[in-house]
Amino acid sequence: MKPELRIDILKDITSKVDVPLVLHGGSSNKDEEIAAAVDNGICKINISSDIKVAFYTQCRKTLNENPGYREPLEIYPEAMEACGKVVEEKIRLFKSNDKVKYYY
């Protein structure tokens, strides 16, 4: 069962509190729902599972294509690249691509 965000409830919460809101378990939500959540007060989104899925999916693919691989340096580079792509997509989805200026 896929998660479904209740943006109507989020709007109600946002109108009543003045604190940054966190979406725990943001993995597997539709991009449209995540974008709407960001537009309605969500400031932090936990997406560890989305990153892990990209990692282990690519590890499996690499190992299936190269059954003789045993060394992490043979297996992990493409998996790490897959993780990076997910992170880049999520940064844009969360409208956080301009936030680095606050940290450097």
Regions found by a protein language model. Name each.
Residues 2-23:
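Alpha-helix-loop-beta-strand connector modules within alpha/beta enzyme cores
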Residues 40-56:
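Glycine-rich phosphate-binding active-site loops on the catalytic face of alpha/beta enzymes
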Residues 22-24, 76-77:
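Active-site mouth loops of central-metabolism enzymes
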Residues 26-42:
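Catalytic cores of alpha/beta
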Residues 24-28, 48-50:
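Active-site beta-loop-alpha junctions enriched in small/polar residues
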Residues 30-33, 53-58, 62:
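Short active-site-adjacent structural elements
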Residues 8-12, 36, 85, 89:
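Alpha-helical scaffolding segments of alpha/beta enzyme cores, especially the outer helices
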Residues 62-104:
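Extended, intrinsically disordered, low-complexity segments
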